[in-house]
């Protein structure tokens, strides 16, 4: 906003703003002064007194919101002074812009509120509206009181202009009359009429309020009168009633009083019962909580007993669940280790069914030989041993000796061959064991081979023992073999 413009404050005031600049709150002066005084006003606008509000007023307002012992620093006072003055200048400039757009010269309270909204102070709009209404009402009341005085003293104010004219004639200068007075004369009459109407309305309102107040005061008196009349009407009726009806009325009244008394007596009993029930419920809850705590303590003790003491010392007896988990893991590992050979055997049986069948066949033969040996009585075994020893001492015939020698040679050869085979098998087994320690399947194969070789050697040893020496007739029974590798004896 630029340029020097004239605007009028408030609805009822006749002061104006002059020399208003952008964002600056210059001091106001009347337009009745001559043009020579304009420069002086511009120079005065630069002073702090014209730019800022008086700091004394600001201090009073601030102290109202503070306790008695509180103090305000100088910096705080100055900052509040600056903020308030700038705030006023911003709002007035915004309101003047609105008036300029609407081609008006007066700044109303509504214009200030609109400026507040446009600047973003929406939270303060409603209380300002309420304050504006109250302010206008108070001004109307004050104007109504002053209106008769103004009507009486309307003639004396005309004398100062005459004196002013005489002075101006003597001085040689005659200024024109102010146009505002000419324009404001009819509105004054209108204002007086409005004030009179308002006074009448206020008087009517006051009368209505007085009437209402009187009615409110008379209401209890009227009620008492009605009650008295009603009682007076009932008394002759009661006198006319027979005694039986009076007794009935008395009984009804007594019953009502007794029921009321019983109700009043039952109320504390019910309250006591409710309190007892609540106490019992609380006791039950406490017992349940104690039982739960005891169960938890027992569980903790059991967990601590399961764990060894040195583990509890290392871990400060604060992690029982961890140790239980470790023990469970160890048990699972042991079970897995125990189940591994069975699983490996089953997998080997599935992969090598022929070897499994051979192993079963050898086991059956071994059991059959043991059964035959156990079936012989002990005295026959002793006789066999004695005869075998005697056969070595007594000189036998040539044929028998030759046969025995041939048999012995054959047996020795067989024994040597068997021993060689056994040694080879053992070496092979050792090599297999050394080479295949890491593979579980190979270990199973080696075990099966070792067992088959041991059974093979035991069968050879029994076969050789049967061919050596002279066998008594009791032991010369044929041995029928189920395996093609071992020939049957005849």
From Swiss-Prot:
Record's subunit section: Heterotrimeric transcription factor composed of three components, nfyA, nfyB and nfyC. nfyB and nfyC must interact and dimerize for nfyA association and DNA binding.
Keywords: Activator, Coiled coil, DNA-binding, Nucleus, Transcription, Transcription regulation
Region feature (Subunit association domain (SAD)): 80-91
GO molecular function: DNA binding; DNA-binding transcription activator activity, RNA polymerase II-specific; DNA-binding transcription factor activity, RNA polymerase II-specific; protein heterodimerization activity; sequence-specific DNA binding
Intracellular or extracellular location(s): Nucleus
Protein family (similarity comment): Belongs to the NFYB/HAP3 subunit family.
Coiled-coil segments on the chain, per record: 188-219, 269-307
GO biological process, one term: regulation of transcription by RNA polymerase II
Protein known as: Nuclear transcription factor Y subunit beta
DNA-binding region boundaries: 53-59
Entry function: Component of the NF-Y/HAP transcription factor complex. The NF-Y complex stimulates the transcription of various genes by recognizing and binding to a CCAAT motif in promoters.
Transmembrane segments: none
